[in-house]
Amino acid sequence: MSPAPAILALRRVYNFCLLVDEAHGFMALGKSGRGSFEWWQDCGYDCPLQEVDIMTGTMSKSLCCIGGFVSANGVYAAELERQRTLQHQNGAETLSTAVLVRILSLINKPKLIKERMTALGRKASFVADCLAQAGCDILSSYGSPVVCFPVGTIQQASRFHEEAMERGFAVACGVPPATPLWSCRVRVCIFATTSWEDILDLINMIIKVSCKLQLKGITATVFTPDTLPKQYLDDPSIAEQSIKSDASICSYVESLSKTYPGGDLEAKAPLNLAQSQEAVEASVKAFSKYGLGPSSARWFYGTFDVFIALERRLAKLYPSLQRHSGRCRAMLGTDAHTMMLSLLSACANPYTSGVMNILLIPTTASLAVQDGADLNRPRAETKIIYYEKLDNLVAKLRELPIDASKLHLTLYLQTTSHDGSSILDLPATVQMINSGMNDPNQLKGLKLILDDSGGLGKVGPHHLGYLDLMERDHGVSFLNQSLGIKLAPKTEIIVTGSFFNAFGQQGGYIISSASFIEVHTVSSKSFVFSTPPTPIQAALSGKVLEILSRGTC
């Protein structure tokens, strides 16, 4: 736990801006779920939230949703309003209605929150007490719902994870560089809704696995049900408040439907009314089957079949890409803006030893693209070049170092203009690259990022985007023919786009060769650390793509 009392004492002396990130504390710490500062207040310290200038948090970890929030005091509140306006102007996505209703339905129930926070504190403290009694060195703050303890080397951490999974428990491991080489950690997350029976099984599993791996200091101990703390009956006023809160939200939604009537459902281009209804029904079925879905990174919880189905459909969406790249795969993102930022950040990393990676980005690229390219610290092996128009690209290329055998180009291209009036001429662009290089044959490799955010849902015979249009006009060999015999084998093509721009609901995607996607699931920070899309989003996007693939009316 961060030393909030000491930080506030320093702030009162030096008057600095204090930003508190409650990504792990919101609805997880404090008697009313307000985070670490409230946790310290509960412990008797003077930590008023009013002295925090900016606070951030997420909805995923405790509200089982996607999205996050920023709140600010004083002068920073005005800047926050300005940033919000800029976000919308730069195409930031809005949260799905189902997610907003979920959030409102939970935070408007203070009695339920207080009861859950009390239960969470009791369960987390019980786990820590039992493990400490067995000799485990608890590294996390007392009462924290994330219980952390050391297990030794990377090999021991890996074996601990494997043994826990075999017993039906998922644990998170912390390894170098986040931890010392000899002191890897295991983190166990406790939930207020976790049953006491599961809590007991978890404790005994940790001790049993620790003894099997011969972790230092752990003694064989078995905790039985009679060691559990006293249970209390539910307060009936909690259910009463929850019912009233839900009724209020339902009434609000009904009033909106009367204020903005539309025959229940309107057609959403490029779909007709019947097809729009079919897509909505698919998302409703997904909600009935999965709820709002998981609230942690994909690798932690595994995956759902609805995600796999959408990824497989995307991977086979463009025959020309398969003809060029061989087996393709796809990956999903919660929002296209963050996914694009993370993609450019990953592509801005050094290519390989002794090779300079040159990123060529138009000045008209979105803020996410520019921020992603500039996110990493400057390195000698990477250079970012911004150009105004494709006509200027040749001049930029001719300014590159003469030793082309040690160059790799990463070129970001928008498949359509912002207003949709022009379409990318890929063959001409490739020709410019060839003419701009001193010796194209010495180029180490080329990576083309085709941003189809303005193409999907708008262009092509099936409204499936840029490659859909090119395949109709030039056939499935379009990409290989555009690149040419010499350049095609050493070119990686990445197609990315936005479900938000195409269909009006959150989400983004990346399609490329299987080898690239498998690496990018590790190099993409947005994939590793962000909450996945909801099953509702995946089902809706998948159904719309299915409808478009078979042809619209």
Swiss-Prot record:
Name of the top EC class for this enzyme: transferase
Gene3D superfamilies hit by this protein: Aspartate Aminotransferase, domain 1, Type I PLP-dependent aspartate aminotransferase-like (Major domain)
Keywords: Endoplasmic reticulum, Glycoprotein, Signal, Transferase
A single GO molecular function term of this UniProt record: serine C-palmitoyltransferase activity
GO CC, any one term: endoplasmic reticulum
InterPro entries reported in the protein's UniProt record: Aminotransferase_I/II_large, AON_synthase_class-II, PyrdxlP-dep_Trfase, PyrdxlP-dep_Trfase_major, PyrdxlP-dep_Trfase_small
Induction: Expression correlates with fumonisin production. Expression is positively regulated by the fumonisin gene cluster-specific transcription regulator FUM21.
Reported consequences of knocking out the gene: Impairs the production of fumonisins.
Known EC number: 2.3.1.-
SUPFAM superfamilies linked: PLP-dependent transferases (SSF53383)
Location(s), subcellular: Endoplasmic reticulum
The keyword Transferase is annotated on this UniProt entry: yes
Glycosylation sites: N480
Pfam families linked: Aminotran_1_2 (PF00155)
The keyword Transferase is assigned to this record: yes
Cofactor needs: pyridoxal 5'-phosphate
Pathway(s) the chain acts in: Mycotoxin biosynthesis
GO annotation (BP), single: ceramide biosynthetic process
Leader sequence residues: 1-25
Record family assignment: Belongs to the class-II pyridoxal-phosphate-dependent aminotransferase family. BioF subfamily.
Functional summary from the UniProt entry: Aminotransferase; part of the gene cluster that mediates the biosynthesis of fumonisins B1 (FB1), B2 (FB2), B3 (FB3), and B4 (FB4), which are carcinogenic mycotoxins.
Protein name per Swiss-Prot or TrEMBL: Aminotransferase FUM8
Native source organism of the sequence: Gibberella moniliformis (strain M3125 / FGSC 7600)
Gene: FUM8
